[in-house]
Amino acid sequence: MIGRIRGLLVEKQAPEVLIDVSGVGYEIQMPLTSFYELPEIGLEAVVFTHFVVREDAQLLYGFISKQERALFRLLIKTNGVGPKLALTILSGMTAGEFVACVERDDIATLVKLPGVGKKTAERLLVEMRDKLKSLMEASVGSEREFMLQSNYTAPVVANTAEEDAIAALLSLGYKPAQASKAVSAVYVDGIDSESLIKSALKSML
């Protein structure tokens, strides 16, 4: 089990990052809520990971805190929720917002997330309610740790903020037309990719 990775952030293209650890590059998929908190390319980062082995692939999912990883692990135990949908849920809302949805029985907000239908939302509310109590108790005094040390500068591939934002939304399961419309609606000159993604996601929830 690979539970934690610390190394140089070499590539950063939502929702995936590449972290170099002693010459070995680890591709890690992250929810956008964690992705936003990463340092700039060329700096050192620490992420907590969940390792998945499938017949056709070995995948790493990364999180900025142990508590976010714990919530991800609870989500994928819910009937009908796999790692991809769990990432989509945690990309569309913070852990705190998800907990609030469960506490309020807020199906209307959950079904706005791509891939979450009414039945899945109902299962999430029922199955997660008791599980979240223990998680939130463990979250008291939680730490967010990532380190920013290095003079290394990695090459950056040029992409416009709009292209980055649309690509990120598509990776979460939104349709091309939905992604383009949402990004165009909130785009302003000079906005960076991460702010544009946040605004576009917020406009769809």
From Swiss-Prot:
It is found in: Cytoplasm. One of its GO terms (molecular function) is four-way junction helicase activity. Residues 65-143 are annotated as: Domain II. Residues 1-64 are annotated as: Domain I. GO terms for cellular component: cytoplasm; Holliday junction helicase complex; Holliday junction resolvase complex. Residues 144-156 are annotated as: Flexible linker. InterPro entries: DNA_helicase_Holl-junc_RuvA_I, Hlx-hairpin-Hlx_DNA-bd_motif, NA-bd_OB-fold, RuvA, RuvA_2-like, RuvA_C, RuvA_C_sf. This is Holliday junction branch migration complex subunit RuvA. It comes from Shewanella piezotolerans (strain WP3 / JCM 13877).
